[in-house]
Amino acid sequence: MPKSLKIILFSVSGFVGLLVLVAAALLLFVDANAYKPRLEAAASEALGMEVRVGGRLGIGFFPGFSITMEDVHIRNRGADLVSAKEARLGIDLFPLLHKQVRIAKIALKHPGVSIERDRGGRYNFENAEAAGGTLPALDLAKVSVSDGTLRYADKQSGDGFEAKDCSLDVRRLRLAEAKSPDLMKNLSFTAELACGVIRTKDFTVSDLKFSADGKNGVFDLKPVTMRIFGGQGSGNIRADFSGAVPTYQVHYSLPQFRIEEFYKTMSKQKIAEGSMDFSANLSMQGKTVNEMTQTANGAASLRGENLTLNGSDLDLEFSRFESSQNFNLVDVGAIFFAGPVGLAVTKGYNFASILKGSRGNSAIRRLVSEWKVERGAAQALDVAMATNENRIALHGGLDFVNGRFNDVTVALIDSKGCAKVRQKISGTFRKPVVEKPNILKTLTGPALRLLKKGRDIFPGGECEVFYAGSVAPPK
C-alpha cells in the first residue's frame, strides 16, 4: 500500500475515533435537558409561535448527530397547532465547529396537526405581524412523518376533514429566501404521502396515496390513488404557482364504484344498486376556492348499465300516470347526479321519497350523464337513462358558483325523443323549486302533481325533439 494512502487512511481512522470519543464524552457528561429552555426560546422565535417540549431531550450520535425531543407542542394564538409524541432533528456535525446549527433531517412520530379557518377567513397558523415578511432559506435532506393525524375545520363554510394513519416522506426540501406570499414559487421537493383513512361529514376515503414533485413553482401530484364508494379511483393534479394567479389541472377517474355506497352518505335505506364509471377533467385558476370555482372548465362523465332502483317500479308508475298524475320525475332524475360531483347537488335531497312509490324495483338498462363545464357551471350534453319500457332525459345546467339549478328539465320521452311528460327544476341546490315555487318549497317535500302531458304542449302529433343522445329507446 502506498505510503500516502496509509497516511490518509490512518488520519481518517484517527479522526473518526476522535469523534466517537467526543460523542461518548458528551453522552456521559452533557445533560441536554439543561438546554431545553434555550431550545424552546430559539424555536419559538424562529417560528413566531410558542414551542414547548413537555418530555425529555436526548442526544444521539449514530447513525448521525441528532437531538430527540419528547412530547413537543407548537401553539399559536393560545391553541395547539402541532403536537408530536417524538421529534428527532438530524444535525450536520461539521457546521457545529463553526458555531452554526444546520438541520439536515426531521423525523416526527405520532404527530397531530390541527388547522382551522375562522369565520373571517384567517387560518390559525397565520400571524398578523408576520404577514408579508421574509421567510428564511431552508435546505433539508429529508423530512419524515409516521402515524400522523391531520384535522381541518373551516368555520366559514362548515366543511372539514380528518386524515388518520398518515405517513410522509419528503426529500430534498428546499426553500429560497423569499417574501411569504411567494412561498410556493420558491419551494422545491419530492415527496410520497399515504393516509389510511380520510373522513368528511359526507363521505370517507381510504388508502389515499400519491407522489409529489415540485420545482420552480410547478407541482405535480401523480398518481393520486384512493378508495371511495367501493371503487378504486386514480388521477393526477398539476398546480402552477409560477404566475401571478395559481392555475390547476385535475384529471380523475373512478371506474366501477358502487352506487349503493354513494347513497349511503345520504340515506340509511338502499336507494339503488350497481356499478358506475365516473371521470372528470377540469382546469381552474384562482387564489381562493370561490375564484377556482368561478373559473372551472372541462368535462365530467357518469355512466352505468344494469342498475337497480329500489322502492319504485318506474314502468308501472309511468303506466298509471294517465289516471293518477301523481308522480315526481325529479325523484327519478336525482340519480343523474350520483358520484363525486353530485355531492354538492344532492346533499339537501331526501332520497327516501324515491322509496314511496309502488314498492317494487326498477331495472335501469343504461344511464349516461355527460356534462360540459364552463366558468363554474355544468351544462348537460347527453343525460338520459332507459328502463325496460321507458326513457327519461334531462336538459339544463348546474351553477356551482351560486349553487343553483339553471332551467333544468326532466322529461319522460317517447321513441322519437319527444317529451311526453316534463318537469322543470330551478332555485338553489338546497331549496330547489319545481314548476311553481309556491307549490314545491324543497326537494324533500311531498310528490308534486305538476307533470304536463306532451299532447297538451304539442297538439297535432308533431313535437320538438327533446332528446337525441346515445341512450337508445327500449325495444
Label for each model-derived stretch:
Residues P2-V16, S283, K287-N297, S301, ...:
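Extended terminal
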Residues K6-L9, L19-I74, L175, V205-S206:
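N-terminal amphipathic/hydrophobic interface segments
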Residues M49, S66, D71-N186, G304-R359, ...:
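Secondary-structure transition motifs
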Residues K105-L108, V143, T190-L193, Y252, ...:
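Extended hydrophobic secondary-structure segments that form protein cores and membrane-embedded regions
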Residues H110, V197-R199, F241, Q256, ...:
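Transmembrane beta-strands of outer-membrane beta-barrel pores
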Residues I115-D118, D202, I259-Y263, L309-D313, ...:
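Outer-membrane beta-barrel proteins
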Residues T190, C195-S211, I364, V368:
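Right-handed parallel beta-helix
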